[in-house]
Amino acid sequence: MKIVISPAKSLNFEKELPTSQYTEPSFLKEARVVHKVVKTKKPSELSELMSISDKLADLNWKRNQDWKTPFTPENARPAVYTFDGDVYTGLDAYSIPLEKLDALQDKLRILSGLYGLLKPLDLMQAYRLEMGTKMPVGESKNLHEFWKPTVTKALNKELKKDELFVNLASNEYFSAVDVKALKVPVITPDFKDYKDGKLKMISFFAKKARGMMVRYIIDTNAETIDDLKGFNYEGYKFDANLSKGNHLVFTR
């Protein structure tokens, strides 16, 4: 099984790491090409490009100036312990037993506007560059177009013929994958909550549930679509009436 998730805007470079293990990102050459473009942007340009405050623009301008390769444990940090948003709250990577790290490293991939595709233990330096940023890179008119061939080829290389491919990323990030070119079907779980008698997709809960689904897969060694349907963390359960084919809906 392979799983893709989105990165997070929030980063944590302070928390003590539970392991000294790390790996090198696969696409640093391509990341340097993207970085070369973003490094030239002034804070005012970053603010407009990313629709962020002046304070955040200044912070990310500094990050862009400081970013450099090669990555080492002294100047970079494993991705799964660095991203700090709702998905990662649900995943709670810090509490994953170390004997399960190999499974996490094998199954999980993180889509990224700067790094393309990261394994959990891949080193990364601080950045902010969402996949939907309308920034031309070379002959590509945006980051989706730049990353799509590389990311899709990498996923196809890793996916075995009958392996499950689970999309737990946002639409913004998953659009960097050429679904038609994938050699396996895509399974897409959705998570909805009943509120005021109505079933809704509530962003915070849905993001957290995506992380919890990754954790469930690792905790239970899930391999089949029926295994996925057994997801029951924090009150969610599979809804057969709302689900169709490879679109799995979980409600609570």
UniProtKB/Swiss-Prot annotation:
InterPro entries: YaaA. It comes from the Bacteria. GO terms for cellular component: cytosol. GO terms for biological process: response to hydroperoxide. Belongs to the UPF0246 family. This is UPF0246 protein Fjoh_4905. It comes from Flavobacterium johnsoniae (strain ATCC 17061 / DSM 2064 / JCM 8514 / BCRC 14874 / CCUG 350202 / NBRC 14942 / NCIMB 11054 / UW101).
